[in-house]
Every structure is written in C-alpha cells, then in structure tokens.
Amino acid sequence: MKRRYFGTDGIRGQSNVFPMTPDLAMRVGIAAGTIFRRGNHRHRVVIGKDTRLSGYMLENAMVAGFTAAGLDAFILGPIPTPAVAMLTRSLRCDIGVMISASHNPYEDNGIKLFGPDGYKLSDDIEAEIEDLLEKDLNAQLAKSDDIGRAKRVDGVHDRYIEHAKRTLPRDVTLQGLRVAIDCANGAAYKVAPAVLWELGADVVTIGNEPNGTNINLNCGSTSPVALQKKVDEVRADIGIALDGDADRVIIIDENGSIVDGDQLMAVIAESWAESQQLRGNGIVATVMSNLGLERFLDERGMALARTKVGDRYVVEHMRQHNYNVGGEQSGHIVLSDYGTTGDGLVAALQILAAVKRTGRTVSEVCRRFEPVPQLLRNVRISGGKPLEDIQVQKAIADAEAELARNGRLVIRPSGTEPLIRVMAEGDDRAQIERIVNELIGTISNVRTAA
C-alpha cells in the first residue's frame, strides 16, 4: 500500500508546505504518542533537532502533540541523530524523535522516529501512525489531569560525548594527529570537535557556526570542497565531513581525495575481522554500493549482503542475520556494537583507530579497493508509473542481459523526491555510459508520452 507521509527515512519535505507543517507535526505527535502509550508507567518522549530555522517551530508542535497524548517530553535541542537514538534508550523513553532533513538544504525538514530500543520504526508501525493520521485524533487526547509535561534536559551533550569516546579502543589516542572536521553547520557543531579534542587530536573545525539557514550550505559531507581546502591549508592528516544531523560521514585523506562510505566499510570490515570483532563474516550494504567492494570482500572470504536503499533496511538485515557492520555508499555507517543507527563521528573514530594502529597515512589505510566505473543519473517524474511500462521493462531486461556478470544495474524510484534513479556499473565505462543514457531516454520518452 502506498504511504502518504513516510518515505525511506521518516517524513520529509519543505518547511511549512504539506506534509512538513506544524499542524501535521502536532498530529504525528498525537498519533505516535497514542501508539506508544501502552502500559501503566509514566510515558516519555525525547525530542532532538538539528539547526534549521524551522526546527523551533516543529519542535514546539511535536511537544504539543505528544503532551496532548499524555507523554512527558524531554527536549534536547540541537543534537546528532545517533545521540537521540542512544538517549531514547538511556533515558528509558517510549519513543524518540529527531527533527531533521539530514543532508538537505535548510528549507527542508523532516521527522525521524525511534522506538524504545533506539531503532527506527518498522514499516508496520509507521503504517499504524499513518492510519491514525487519517482519523479524528480528538478521541486520542489524554484526560485533563493526564496531559504530559515538557522539560528541557541539560547535560545530554556530555552523555553523547562520553559514549562516542568509548568507541575508540582504550589503547588508542589521537595524539599526534591533526584532524580537520566540517560539522556542516549542523547538529554536531559542538559535540564532534569536543570528542576529537578530548581524545587528544589537534582539531581544526569548520562548519561550526550555524545560523538557521546555513546548514549543509557549501559544507558537510555532500559538499566537501571547503574541507578539502582546509585539509590542504592546515596540512591536516585527515578531514572528517559530517552531514546536517551527523548520521553520515565522508573522509578526506591527506592529499585531499574523497573517501566514500564503501571504502570506509571496507576498512572497518578488514580491521574488525583481524581483531575478531566482526560478526557474520561480512557486512551489509545497499544495492547502490560499488561492485568493487563486493569483490574486495569476496577475495578475503567475507560476504556482502545487499538490501534496498535506506539505512533502516540495512539495520533490519543486520539485526536479522547478526551482522555488526553495515552502511551505505553515501556515508551512513552503522556499527551495531556501538549504536542502533548511522553515526558519522563513531565511524570516523574507527578509521582513526586503524590509522593509529597501522602507522600508515589515511590514503594508505582507506584505499582498500579500486571502484568499478559507476554512473548514476536521475529522471524527474511528475506522475504515472514509467517503470511499469512494457518498453521500459524490455529495455531494462536487455541492459541486464548485456551486463551479465560483468556489471550491475539498479533502477528505482527515489524515496524522498519525485525521481527515478538509474545506476549502472561495470568494468567497461563506455558500455556503462551508453546503457544509462539509453535507459534515461526510454524512461523520458514514456514519461513525455504519458
């Protein structure tokens, strides 16, 4: 069944435009609060946000919704998404909320929900919330004497700082390393530099002056040019680029080259396998991860399990099959020994541990495999279902047959935008470009005809 509100990572959209309005945010609070208001204990919700201008508006709306449903609301202010997941558990809350649109520009915002175990909600529970949102919620309001209380909680940043520091092996310090970090003017602008400094690094920070409208603006993991320049300027050993809510990371090596999530997963998998920390004898990634990663792992006797796009699906597969390393090419790295969702800072600390233990440079540590040529293009759609068209399906089948075992083809609708994503990869770059261009043309023709 097609969902109206939830996408691959919660609810997301332009602020003050449906569905990302204060009215819907309040209704989500009532609906989600109703579902998690079970048992006789006093029910609680923890609410965090990033640094977007609209965060204050949506935070107040969600506090109103949850307290109207009878839950006490713990308000955290700007804090990373993985910290919200961690605090949902440690504060014994029934549900956790992160108000963020991750790597999107400030005009957008979103709502991510976590269960009491710190994991993102399942499709089934999100469907329950959607079902309630379509009904009259007045019947779900708490009695007058059961309305929840709202409280701003102090000291939560220190809790997350200590949690992140504990993920670095105790025999490792960051002394002697110059680390440049770009906080994307986002949720980690205070905590990330503090963690690195307390672990001994010489820290150079950019993207740590949020003003409500500059989150992810020419900074962060999706725009690493500023960090590349800073690494060169200060001769840093490594650059760490987080996104707006700090659940993803991209590394810049000492030469200014970008290291994506696939390479980071390869480093962590190999390092953890050597220390016998790796579970499942492999890792979990999405269909978008490079074929080079799969070959790298296979050569070392490790497996790559693939899921559909979205870190929540990576986490679900990890939980079901006892893996402890997973992630996405985009830099969502999930290390279940340390958390329940992607954590850019914790992932970066594992890379720093490998650098310190081996005594090698970041470029030497992080270039674990040669990626095969990969091309991703998007087709914007305004309606219809072009992937169900017979001509498109035949073109896809022909392309898959041509690639055979020498490449891969992934075609899927975006979970957050009105786009169809076409990705192909293989050893022959010219072949890949031709296949993608032909498929784009076929899909565009069908869309135009419709």
Swiss-Prot record:
Cofactor(s) listed: Mg(2+)
Positions contributing to Mg(2+) binding: 102, 243, 245, 247
GO cellular component terms listed in the entry, alphabetical order: cytosol
Active site: 102
The record's account of how the chain is modified after translation: Activated by phosphorylation.
Pfam family, one: PGM_PMM_III
Sequence positions bearing Phosphoserine: 102
Membrane-spanning ranges: none
Name recorded for this polypeptide: Phosphoglucosamine mutase
Species for this entry: Rhizobium etli (strain ATCC 51251 / DSM 11541 / JCM 21823 / NBRC 15573 / CFN 42)
